[in-house]
Amino acid sequence: NIPAIITNCSNNYGPRQHPEKLIPKLIYNILNNKTLPIYGKGLNSREWIYVDDHCEALIIVSKKGKIGNFYNIGSNINLNNLEITKHLLKFAKSKTKIGKNVKIKFVKDRPGHDLRYALNSNKIIKNLKWKPKVGILKGLEITFDWYLKNPNYYLKLKKKDITRRLGNKSK
């Protein structure tokens, strides 16, 4: 037997996230005056957790969690893709002149794309006394500010070919 604890988490976001993910992709497009592609009607909902909160939860689980148990790590904050996009556009308008004329383009949804991802995190909250500290608006603002201050991050990754995942064709 291997002593183990299993965790599941909701959608992470924050600085240095892989640029193909929704939030960094939207920020990159906003800061480069590119169209914002939104799947379907933008109503796909996700439970979002700021990366630092997820890391803190993992540390707490490693110290206080019980062997053989599983813990869901989430924020109970659900926003759809269109809501995330609108918040990021508000940050752009208040913090920079870039991205003020960016347009949203609704694109065909991926086949089998789930409408909602969410977790029940009551066990970790109740048993381990953990809860996330960073609210969604604060986390999005921190993330937006980081990408604003690090405009070459995506380009550096692209040079290392880290933006190409296995099975994807190079662009």
Spans of features found by a protein language model:
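Conserved beta-loop-beta element that borders a ligand/cofactor-binding pocket
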Residues: 1-15, 37
